[in-house]
């Protein structure tokens, strides 16, 4: 059975989600539609990309992922269908694709499929659903549009020198854990076995990496590398972002 996932910033109180599902089922009744999340903050492309990037490979190859965050089409932000790692994505190129693809090779096209209505404010229902079904039915990208090179994201990358790494909070999850843009690979590369101090929130420091949240007593802060591969700052059984006064883009620095 074909699988189509949905990710959006619509929430669950309006008609948008069921309308899109209805459109998909009308075109392909025998399909499994999976909600990744509809609770992304409005227009928060970065968070949507982080969520999808960290779960899409757990789905079977051939799954189609519909990205419905900031979908309005323009000459700068075209509607695009993309294939990477044997998964398909349909959405608007507002840099969400480059955040998901990262350094992986991909194939992309600008969608040249007419939608069935004259309304252009609900492209996910009127166009993306149609393209997602086409991909689920095995239609090649070459029949959906012309080749396209996705836009590069201008997201801040960690800077580093011989004695420090300077990063920031990239994402805050439902537990208020602070996920940074510092990868474990970069940390180990620059650390080179040296002692280190992680500084954050203006006055807090950590001098070790934990394996789990339970490595420290309740209400103490800690640092670990999660399954996503990034440095994470958390408080055992509590909310790090709120209690530490931190937010996305807050600085996190590591000194050696």
Predicted regions and their residues:
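General beta-strand structural signal in soluble alpha/beta enzymes
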Residues: 6, 33-36, 67, 89-92, ...
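N-terminal glycine-/serine-/threonine-rich phosphate-binding loop
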Residues: 1-76
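A conserved acidic, glycine/proline-rich C-terminal tail/linker
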Residues: 179-245
């Amino acid at each position: 059975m074909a699988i189509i996932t949905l990710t959006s910033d619509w929430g669950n109180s309006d008609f948008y989600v069921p309308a899109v599902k209805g459109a998909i089922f009308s075109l392909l009744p025998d399909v499994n539609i999976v909600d990744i999340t509809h609770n992304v903050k409005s227009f928060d492309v970065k968070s949507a990309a982080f969520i999808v990037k960290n779960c899409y490979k757990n789905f079977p190859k051939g799954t189609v992922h519909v990205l419905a965050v900031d979908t309005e089409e323009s000459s700068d932000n075209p509607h695009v269908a993309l294939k990477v790692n044997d998964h398909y994505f349909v959405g608007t190129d507002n840099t969400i694709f480059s955040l998901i693809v990262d350094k992986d090779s991909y194939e992309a096209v600008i969608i040249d499929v007419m939608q069935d209505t004259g309304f252009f404010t609900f492209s996910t229902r009127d166009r993306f659903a149609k393209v997602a079904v086409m991909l689920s039915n095995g239609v090649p990208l070459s029949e959906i549009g012309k080749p396209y090179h996705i836009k590069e994201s201008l997201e801040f990358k960690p800077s580093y020198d011989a004695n420090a790494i300077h990063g920031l909070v990239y994402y805050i999850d439902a537990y208020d854990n602070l996920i940074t843009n510092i990868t474990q690979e970069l940390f180990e590369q620059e650390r080179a076995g040296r002692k280190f101090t992680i500084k954050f929130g203006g006055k807090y420091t950590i001098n070790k990496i934990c394996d789990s949240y339970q490595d420290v007593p309740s209400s103490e802060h800690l640092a670990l590398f999660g399954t996503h591969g990034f440095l994470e700052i958390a408080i055992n059984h509590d909310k790090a972002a709120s209690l530490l006064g931190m937010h996305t883009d807050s600085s996190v620095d590591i000194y050696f």
